[in-house]
A protein has these predicted regions:
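Acidic anion/phosphate-binding donor-loop and adjacent secondary structure
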Residues: 130-131, 170-185
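Extended catalytic core of nucleotide-activated donor transferases of GT-like folds
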Residues: 7, 47-157
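Short alpha-helical donor nucleotide-sugar binding micro-motif in glycosyltransferases
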Residues: 267-272
Length: 293
């Protein structure tokens, strides 16, 4: 059986859980098959027009530059266009499979594709929105990270023969037990609880912080390290500091980290004493899995 030649459509650039999973997954997959990527997102260091517009992101490496062949950009209120990128890293081949790895209801799922197409989606509820679910049914295969999501999808009406479980992986060369030296404001003899994940009702962020403040007295040598910014929350509070103030949760033991670099994130995970997670629902929860590793 010949190996597939895959054209992936995904949000490759960025620092969200979806972005990190996408990069790790496609970097690994590219070691085994021909793979190229159409990317939807841009990072904070976006540089356009430019043949290499994502070089300002500190996580972009030569593998990424080879994989990234096309960039989607909005050209009008409801119109998108595709632009070639990283042409100095040749990766031309005729693909025979399309793979869409995106969040629920993303534009890429609704695009027209020639040939077999696979939908890879992470969702934290028992039901998909009806319009989106009907679109999923048009795909040749449906990939999900857990047996639970696969079972929910079949229960909603998908053909069991099309549903596959493809777990999200962890880079074991990056996430492994050790006691790394760090220059971060972190190793000071105090016990560190850590929370990584956007401020969200689903993730019980407010309740975790409330519980920490109720459990530990101010004179105890315990800190709560939080990286919980959510610029898309819709609550009008705009920042983690404003949310803590709004809910009466300000405390010097809460150490706020605004979107730390990948390197710093790894260091925080490895140096933390306890990783806290108490989500009402999760599609996968990559930071928790990485902390466990």
């Amino acid at each position: 059986m010949k190996k597939p030649k895959v054209y992936a459509h995904a949000s490759y650039v960025g620092t969200t859980g979806y972005n990190n999973h996408t990069r790790d997954f496609f970097r690994s997959l590219s070691k085994h098959i021909d793979l190229k990527v159409r990317n939807f997102t841009i990072g904070k260091n976006w540089n356009w027009p430019n043949n290499e517009p994502h070089n300002g992101e500190d996580y972009i490496n030569d593998t990424d530059k080879k994989l990234l062949v096309e960039q989607t950009l909005w050209t009008g209120k409801d119109t998108r266009s595709e632009f070639p990128i990283y042409s100095d890293y040749p990766n031309e081949f005729k693909h025979n499979v399309n793979l869409v790895l995106e969040e629920t209801n993303h534009h890429y799922f609704y695009d027209d594709y020639v040939g077999p197409k696979i939908a890879y989606n992470v969702w934290e509820s028992t039901l998909q929105p009806e319009q989106f679910f009907n679109k999923l049914l048009e795909y040749d295969q449906l990939w999900f990270p857990s047996q639970w999501q696969a079972d929910c999808t079949i229960a909603q009406g998908a053909d069991p023969n099309k549903v596959k479980v493809v777990p999200e992986g962890v880079d074991t060369k990056t996430f492994f037990p050790e006691d790394p030296v760090t220059k971060l404001d972190y190793v000071d003899g105090r016990f560190k609880f850590i929370v990584f994940g956007r401020w969200d009702y689903r993730k019980s962020t407010k309740e975790i912080i409330e519980t920490f403040l109720k459990e530990f007295k101010p004179n105890e040598p315990v800190d709560l390290i939080v990286s919980i910014d959510n610029p898309f929350s819709g609550d009008g509070l705009e920042s983690t500091e404003n949310r803590l103030k709004h809910f009466g949760l300000e405390d010097p033991r809460i150490k706020i980290k605004h979107f730390p670099s990948r390197e710093d994130y790894i260091t925080y995970i490895k140096n933390g004493h306890v990783f806290l997670s108490c989500a009402r629902s999760e599609g996968w929860n990559l930071p928790l899995i990485e902390a466990m590793a």
